[in-house]
């Protein structure tokens, strides 16, 4: 059967964290089928195209008629007077040395630089143009109408909405606004980097809701210029929310260059939290949003992943990008939008404060060294301090991590990602097509069992051949396909492309992957201590904390690792991956957490499956090894050198084979994104000096030698 991309394996809308935000007595809406926004104009929007399949579409001037007939009923007041007269801005002006008149003029300039100027007429025109753009770029643009109904109900409460999408493509800026217009929701004010405020185009973005923020501020700030700028920006966000207008910004701060969620930044979310804490607004809804693309319109960021600096946006570059994107029809394939359940910020503040406070005493002291592992006991990236109270910075980090985790976990998986995952983690060479198709079905079932959803896949119904056929059309540049065999093309760009797609799958199996890697790094048949597996898995999580979000702030990572080992798939007495040394005594009761004892891998088939899971994260551990070994070698400069130059040099030398390694590196492990995160974690743990910002020099730290030795142990396949 062909892929039914509008179907879904998830039949109920739910909050992924029902520990923090239980639904209580609410009736959970059922999710029906996704609807295609590109079809709305053909049916005049109402009823939805899926309601009456017998109705034939009316294509004559459909987009034009629909765009002008759907009203923009909401009001978007100008907040300039409110911002410039706010207490926050006046307080900053009164502190500065220059005359008040000069500072007031500067404040007006900053407001003009930042503010959106939303125009209903321009939005109407753009809504029509975007129909043409999206039809060219996409096969379908799918949303869940039940999710939109939940958003509509939340908006009717009068509490402002804050949309927090993951960031994959520049198209992300357009999708929420366009989707909200279809469903009669308010159009958001969208935080955009000032790099997009281009001559001749900035006004158009402002007219559709964009407000621009500086990507960098002056760290010296002798004249208080940036202090005033921050006050204007902060007050602008407060005033927009106080007028019940929604805001949209990307917690990650920038587009993901490698296909996975980034750790959140604290900037704009801290302004929203402060506005609620200080009572400027009573509350707001936080709405996680994510997107599933078969391919992003910009393509893979290959040059940036090789350490080549990003070219700053320009008007000419925009037109080049448009021409490149339009040169191939349906480049993005099927695109899905996912909206999480709106949660009030006050609920986040209450539940996360309670969770972090109650769990604090059970967390081990940071940097408690293990004798046989190569890191530390717990991953607490949102909890850097050890005071008895939860400070504001910790709270803001926790909220950011919680929202991004929710967004990544509700994201559907593209068939392109499923195929890419198998090509890299299981079959890196030639494999028969029939075997590969069966494995596609197997992996889709695993994703569904983990609570995920694969676009177009219906459990026990969809054939792997349909998935493979669909995905290969999008991967023709990096996969060799015949009627009998499948294999990836042997080039760095091909493996990077496949890795970009594969990385969206890892969040479903991240904890399983690190556990599997600790197991397969030991010789076959070796007795495995459960305590040691857990400690080594936590160590790997710690070292990969800037690559993946393994759990929510309210979760205990240690408990989750134990729970995975206790799952039926792992501990079933007959079919589990692991066999207890005392199974005959009734030790294993599949489904409960395992806390002690010794285990063995059951058989060769179980080890093969564990090897697949381990290979999901192996490239990232290899990247950490490559960076660690490079910064202690003679190839690394002795004087502080910019991180970008270090990374670019390492990429070039690794691909040229100029670096001696005890293993053959996976080509996808050679990329700037993973190297940056590796440098970041080495500096975070004090293994590299931070004397010069964004720079690295050769290190003689003895702890690096210990790390390298232990990484070699983990990366060795036995």
Swiss-Prot record:
Q: How does it sit in the membrane?
A: Single-pass membrane protein
Biological process GO annotation list? CDP-diacylglycerol biosynthetic process; glycerophospholipid metabolic process; triglyceride biosynthetic process
The record's InterPro entries line, in alphabetical order, gives: GPAT/DHAPAT (IPR022284), GPAT/DHAPAT_C (IPR045520), GPAT/DHAPAT_LPLAT (IPR041728), GPAT_PlsB (IPR028354), Plipid/glycerol_acylTrfase (IPR002123)
User: SUPFAM superfamilies given for it?
Assistant: Glycerol-3-phosphate (1)-acyltransferase
Ordered alphabetically, the record's keywords are: Acyltransferase, Lipid biosynthesis, Lipid metabolism, Membrane, Mitochondrion, Phospholipid biosynthesis, Phospholipid metabolism, Transferase, Transit peptide, Transmembrane, Transmembrane helix
Chemical reaction(s) catalysed: sn-glycerol 3-phosphate + an acyl-CoA = a 1-acyl-sn-glycero-3-phosphate + CoA
Instruction: Offer an example of a GO molecular function term for this protein.
Output: glycerol-3-phosphate O-acyltransferase activity
Q: What GO cellular component is one of the record's annotations?
A: mitochondrion
Where mainly found?
mitochondrion
Q: What CDD domains has UniProt attached to this entry?
A: LPLAT_DHAPAT-like
Q: What is its EC number?
A: 2.3.1.15
- Please give the start and end residues of each transmembrane region: 409-425
* Keyword field contains Transmembrane helix: yes
Q: In which pathway does it act?
A: Phospholipid metabolism; CDP-diacylglycerol biosynthesis; CDP-diacylglycerol from sn-glycerol 3-phosphate: step 1/3
| Motif HXXXXD motif positions after renumbering to this chain | 167-172
UniProt enzyme class: transferase
Keyword Acyltransferase in annotation: yes
Q: Which Pfam families match?
A: Acyltransferase, GPAT_C
Where does it live in the cell? Mitochondrion membrane
Cited PANTHER family: BCDNA.GH07066, GLYCEROL-3-PHOSPHATE ACYLTRANSFERASE
Fill in the domain comment: The HXXXXD motif is essential for acyltransferase activity and may constitute the binding site for the phosphate moiety of the glycerol-3-phosphate.
Family according to the record: Belongs to the GPAT/DAPAT family.
This chain belongs to the protein called Probable glycerol-3-phosphate acyltransferase, mitochondrial
Species of provenance: Caenorhabditis elegans
């Amino acid at each position: 059967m062909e892929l039914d991309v509008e179907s879904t394996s998830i039949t109920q809308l739910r909050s992924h964290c029902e520990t923090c935000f239980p639904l209580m007595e609410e009736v959970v809406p059922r999710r029906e089928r996704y609807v295609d926004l590109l079809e709305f104009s053909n049916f005049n929007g109402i009823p939805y195209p899926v309601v009456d399949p017998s109705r034939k579409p009316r294509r004559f001037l459909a987009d034009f008629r629909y765009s002008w007939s759907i009203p923009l009923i909401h009001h978007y007041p100008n907040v300039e007077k409110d911002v410039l007269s706010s207490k926050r801005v006046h307080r900053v002006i009164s502190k500065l040395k220059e005359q008040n008149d000069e500072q007031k003029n500067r404040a007006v300039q900053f407001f003009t630089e930042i503010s959106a100027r939303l125009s209903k007429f321009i939005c109407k025109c753009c809504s029509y143009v975007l129909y043409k753009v999206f039809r060219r770029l996409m096969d379908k643009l799918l949303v869940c109408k039940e999710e939109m109904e939940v958003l509509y109900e939340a908006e009717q409460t009068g509490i402002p909405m804050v949309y927090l999408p993951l960031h994959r493509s520049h198209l992300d800026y357009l999708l929420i606004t366009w989707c909200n217009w279809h469903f009669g929701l308010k159009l958001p004010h969208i935080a955009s980097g000032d790099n997009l405020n281009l001559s001749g185009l900035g006004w158009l973005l402002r007219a559709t809701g964009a407000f621009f923020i500086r990507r960098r501020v002056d760290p010296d700030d002798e004249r208080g210029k940036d202090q005033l700028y921050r006050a204007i920006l902060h007050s602008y966000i407060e005033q927009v929310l106080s007028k019940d207008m929604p805001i949209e910004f990307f917690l990650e701060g920038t587009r993901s260059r490698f296909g996975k969620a980034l750790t959140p930044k604290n900037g704009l979310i801290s302004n929203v939290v402060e506005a609620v804490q200080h009572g400027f607004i009573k509350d707001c809804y936080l709405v996680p949003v994510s997107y599933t693309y078969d391919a992003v319109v910009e393509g893979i960021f290959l040059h940036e992943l090789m350490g080549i600096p990003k070219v700053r946006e320009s008007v000419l570059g925009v037109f080049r990008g448009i021409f490149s994107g339009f040169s191939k029809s349906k480049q993005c394939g099927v695109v899905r939008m996912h909206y999480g359940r709106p949660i009030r910020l006050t609920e986040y503040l209450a539940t996360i404060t309670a969770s972090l406070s109650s769990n604090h005493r059970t967390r081990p002291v940071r940097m408690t060294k293990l004798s046989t592992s190569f890191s530390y006991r717990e991953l607490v990236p949102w909890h850097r301090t050890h005071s008895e109270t939860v400070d504001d910075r910790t709270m803001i980090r926790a909220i950011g991590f919680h929202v991004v985790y929710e967004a990544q976990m509700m994201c559907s998986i593209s068939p392109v990602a499923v195929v890419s995952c198998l090509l890299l983690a299981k079959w890196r060479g030639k494999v028969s097509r029939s075997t590969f198709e069966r494995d596609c079905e197997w992996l889709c079932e695993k994703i569904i069992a983990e609570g995920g959803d694969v676009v177009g896949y219906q459990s026990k119904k969809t054939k792997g051949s349909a998935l493979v056929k669909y995905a290969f059309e999008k991967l023709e540049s990096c996969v060799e396909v015949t009627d009998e065999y499948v294999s990836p093309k042997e080039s760095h760009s091909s493996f990077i492309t496949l890795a970009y797609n594969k990385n969206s799958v890892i969040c479903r199996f991240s904890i399983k992957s690190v556990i599997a890697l600790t197991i397969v790094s030991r010789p076959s048949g070796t007795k495995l201590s459960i305590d040691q597996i857990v400690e080594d898995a936590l160590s790997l999580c710690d070292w990969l904390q800037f690559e993946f979000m393994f759990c929510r702030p309210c979760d205990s990572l240690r408990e989750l690792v134990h729970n995975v080992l206790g799952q039926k798939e792992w501990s079933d007495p007959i079919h589990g991956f692991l066999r207890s040394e005392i199974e005959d005594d009734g030790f294993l009761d599949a489904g409960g957490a395992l806390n002690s004892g010794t285990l063995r891998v059951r058989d060769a088939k179980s080890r093969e499956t564990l090897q697949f899971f381990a290979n999901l994260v192996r490239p990232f551990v290899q990247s950490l090894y490559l960076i660690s070994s490079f910064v202690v070698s003679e190839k690394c400069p002795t004087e502080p050198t910019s991180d970008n130059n270090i990374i670019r040099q390492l990429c070039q030398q690794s691909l040229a084979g100029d670096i001696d390694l005890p293993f053959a590196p996976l080509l996808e492990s050679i990329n700037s994104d993973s190297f940056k995160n590796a440098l970041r974690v080495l500096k975070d743990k004090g293994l590299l000096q931070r004397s010069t910002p964004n720079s690295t020099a050769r290190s003689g730290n003895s702890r690096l030698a210990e790390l390298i030795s232990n990484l070699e142990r983990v990366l060795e396949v036995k």
